[in-house]
Amino acid sequence: KYDFTSPDYRAQKISELARLPITGDAVWIDAGTRRRADFAFADGVFGFYQHRSKAIVPVRCCPLCCAAINDVLPAVASLPWGGAGAVLVTACDNGIDIAVTSAVPYFSSEFKNAAARLDVLRVTWNGRVVVQNATPIVKFGDVSVEYPPGAFLQPTIVGADILRDMVVAAAAGAHRCADLFCGLGNFTYALGADGFDIAGAGVRRDLFHNPLTVGMLNKYDCVVMDPPRAGAIAQCTELVKSNVGRVIYISCNPQTWVRDAEILKQKYSLVSLVPVDQFVGSAHWELFSLFA
């Protein structure tokens, strides 16, 4: 069993960020905490893709995943997987949600019958409900939100809590905040509960091709952004022309963070950059940054 708390692991992983202007100590998340994991299936085999390969390694337990996911993995792996596709397994606050995406448009009756025997909240196939025993729920503080099939969540609860606290602290003193690429509201509800006048965007607005314009941004003195791996180049281009005084940028891709940071530096100074190891056992990092 690999020790993800070892000095060797941490030294090797942090070395991948050697060229970044990091201002604070890295935050390390333990293994066994992932609440969402992407699996693959093909030719009846369910598991993870082998590194740099299209071959699938069968999986019935994952030391990186939380106990709730590992409890159902053997049964999920044993489903009659026809065709090929991807499976997102998510541990919601009240149980497990399974979202299948596949080029095969419809699930078989055999798959439906087998899925009905799983101890899960819901199984969907290309967004169509196969089985639903209850509505999946995720909580952000005191707020309970219905979880749509395949929706984004921070990969770990502890990581989400840490980032949320960092965002609230970095926004201190601001009055009106915009939470862009807000997803289900990991930061939105926390900022609202802390007394900020907060608006969320990104659920229905394509911020990649239709970013908030300067006129829209000028209503706010703080902007929070947590874009997907592609980053937020269009939105950053608008921000540097605006009157927004503070940008809190959370990134899951150091490469696009570097690109976007160069744009933001046309107007702002980098105040802090802290790496968070939410993706234990991989080369990926989460970055928390504040520009002002």
Label every PLM stretch briefly.
Residues K1-M225, A230-T237:
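Accessory RNA-recognition modules of RNA-modification enzymes
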Residues R36, H284-S289:
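Short hydrophobic/aromatic beta-strand or adjacent loop that forms the aromatic wall/cage
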Residues V100, F288-F291:
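Short beta-strand element of the conserved SAM-dependent methyltransferase core
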Residues F140, F291-A292:
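Active-site beta-strand termini and strand-to-loop segments that position acidic
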Residues D206-W285:
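S-adenosylmethionine
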